[in-house]
Regions:
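Acidic (Asp/Glu-rich) sequence patches and key acidic residues
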Residues: 1-165
Length: 165
């Protein structure tokens, strides 16, 4: 029990290669389907969910970062992404917001100033002390976001934050 924090990345996978679709004749969506689309749907065991040709893609979601009791970073998400609502909901995080968090963490580390990212009190949220665990959580956040920004598909990903406590 405690504050668990998750960042997931989602990507839309097209089902249809529109360049291969013969629109002059009878439309055959199966012949224009990207093979990886069917592989993804089958790997997820969802092939029976989609039963018509009106579905043109799927969203794939992967957990890409996890924090445990890094309440200062959670506080940042609550105030900057969740509009002050600390409700364990799932919230969209734009690339700009991730870059803003990255810069805030870097500033805090460079100045050794916790005023940039203040800890948040909460039931089972962990320590409020500004100690090595606090700075380790900030450093870990920098490492995770920098890793994500270096992905070739960074601009094509949608990110979502959710906490559990």
């Amino acid at each position: 029990m405690g504050l668990d924090m998750y960042l997931s990345a989602r990507k839309y996978i097209n089902k249809i290669d529109w360049n291969k679709l013969d629109r002059a004749g009878e439309v055959d969506y199966d012949s224009a389907t990207f093979p990886q689309y069917n592989e993804i749907v089958q790997a997820a065991g969802l092939q029976d969910v989609q039963q018509n040709n009106e579905i043109y893609g799927a969203n794939v979601s992967v957990n890409c970062a996890y924090w445990r009791k890094v309440n200062a970073v959670h506080n940042w998400f609550v105030n900057n992404v969740q509009k002050g609502e600390d409700d364990c909901g799932e919230y969209y995080v734009s690339q700009d917001k991730l870059l803003e968090l990255l810069q805030t963490c870097k500033n805090a580390l460079a100045k050794r100033d916790p005023q940039e990212l203040m800890p948040q009190a909460g039931f089972f949220f962990g320590s409020y002390d500004i100690d090595e665990y606090y700075w380790g959580g900030i450093k870990y956040t920098v490492e995770q976001i920098e890793r994500l920004t270096k992905l070739k598909d960074f601009d094509n990903l949608s990110f979502y934050y959710q906490s559990s406590w």
